[in-house]
Swiss-Prot record:
Gene for this chain: rplC
GO biological process, one term: translation
Family that this chain belongs to: Belongs to the universal ribosomal protein uL3 family.
Quaternary structure (record): Part of the 50S ribosomal subunit. Forms a cluster with proteins L14 and L19.
Residues that span the membrane, as ranges: none
InterPro entries cross-referenced by the UniProt entry: Ribosomal_uL3, Ribosomal_uL3_bac/org-type, Ribosomal_uL3_CS, Transl_B-barrel_sf
Species this chain originates from: Nostoc sp. (strain PCC 7120 / SAG 25.82 / UTEX 2576)
Domain of life: Bacteria
The protein's name: Large ribosomal subunit protein uL3
Amino acid sequence: MSVGILGTKLGMTQIFDEAGVAIPVTVVQVGPCVVTQVKSKQTDGYAAIQVGYGEVKPKALNRPLLGHLAKSSAPALRHLKEYHTDGSSDYALGQEIKADIFSVGELVDVIGTSIGRGFAGNQKRNNFGRGPMSHGSKNHRAPGSIGAGTTPGRVYPGKRMAGRLGGTRVTIRKLTVIRVDAERNLLLIKGAVPGKPGALLSIVPAKKVGK
């Protein structure tokens, strides 16, 4: 796995290409991330780097975490994430990772947390159809039958029903980087990404680049 970067979703907008075609993009504030730990196969059994993002006041973190960050001379960082890479020896403690690790046209995977919708019914959560709306029907948005009769005499596990919607880890694959602003550490990524503005995102080179 290649090294990625952490960032914050700022929102969506649109830009226009040379032909005047509008391209919907998500603006992501990425990094700068600080390398807080370098792991190798000799000492840890696998090669990876740990990066930190999101500077906060030291009082917001506990002492063990502050001590860990002090080893790399990093400021107080709220978010830590590990990226597996065979080239972990190419990174040093305290090194900054910025938006320029990506290039225009590159495919990336964006990992985040989907917007939480709370408790939702069958139609919204599972895209089920509704019941008749007239002619004396009293079953409009109700789920209807959820099982068989005496046999098996129970509801099968995994039955799609009403419940909590959203607020889960989501990966959107193979999104295209439309623009890289290295000075302001901004990425413009084609399409939508998980979460609402202000959400934490992890952006990595796409794993699956085929069709």
